[in-house]
Amino acid sequence: MKASTSRAKLHPRNQHLNGYDLDLLTEQHPALSAFIITTPAGTKSIDFSDNKAVKTLNQALLKAHYNVDFWDIPQHNLCPPIPGRVDYIHYLADLLADDNQTQIPTGRQVKVLDIGTGANLVYPLTGGHEYNWHFTGTDIDPAAIKVAKQIAQFNNLKITLKQQKNAANIFKGVINSKDLYHLTLCNPPFHASSEDAVKGSERKWKNLGKAPSSTLNFGGQNNELWCEGGEVQFISNMIKESAAVAEQVMWFTSLVSKKDNIAALEQELKQHPIAQYKIVDMAQGQKVSRFIAWSYFDKATREQICEELE
């Protein structure tokens, strides 16, 4: 059974709903002041085509809003936009609330699996702060896991990190038979090739009115940006694999960057004994994103699982 939800702007609980308070951010993280510019309209901003500026903005946002005192990632790793990433977290909280008499389950007993957590660790950092959930992050890149562990340790955060040692697997080797995760989340590689990734970067440069860079700006290593078959293939593989761990996860979810990919994913979902799936739209400024969620448990069983959290 399918359900659909649509929104018009950032989630109401998103701390960035009304934009950035640059005065607060520079007060909390003075290094940001070096990157503040004045726009033609006379407002303060930063140059979003400058990787160092974006990284420093993220450091300020994480410190001011999520109590993350230390956050540093290698230049080549993905530097995510915090507001959009946090939106996903808030909508996931609503997904759980739908099975818990409209109350958002909070606390360490809520288990969340982050597929492809990356060096940036953004979902465990923000989701842990907002709802105190316990996160397990996985990644195929040992260097990313190493950086993520350093961030967690420096901030004295209890985040479980696991390396996925087989690039052909998503859940296998990560989810054990005795595990029960209430959510999985994923920001999948959305390009089908390195050439597509380069073109995507060039489009972003053009939108910012800049000449293209010789490197993949906006951060991101190959495994973060593209995989064979693009996001449709990646998420389809995730759906196929989910059947083997159907009883270990209440809700499987993944971001879907392209609306046109939804139909193919719905067809894949219909090949499996899924009790319910949802497509949730998230409008973030000029960009509209969405995630797909599916569960092998019927609503009554999900409600019972949530009752056991109390």
UniProtKB/Swiss-Prot annotation:
One of its GO terms (cellular component) is cytoplasm. It catalyses: adenosine(1618) in 23S rRNA + S-adenosyl-L-methionine = N(6)-methyladenosine(1618) in 23S rRNA + S-adenosyl-L-homocysteine + H(+). Keywords: Cytoplasm, Methyltransferase, rRNA processing, S-adenosyl-L-methionine, Transferase. GO terms for molecular function: 23S rRNA (adenine(1618)-N(6))-methyltransferase activity. The keyword Methyltransferase applies. CDD domains: AdoMet_MTases. One of its GO terms (biological process) is rRNA base methylation. It is found in: Cytoplasm. It holds the Pfam family Methyltransf_10. The keyword NADP does not apply. Its main location: cytoplasm. Its EC number is 2.1.1.181. Belongs to the methyltransferase superfamily. METTL16/RlmF family. Specifically methylates the adenine in position 1618 of 23S rRNA. This is Ribosomal RNA large subunit methyltransferase F. The gene is rlmF.
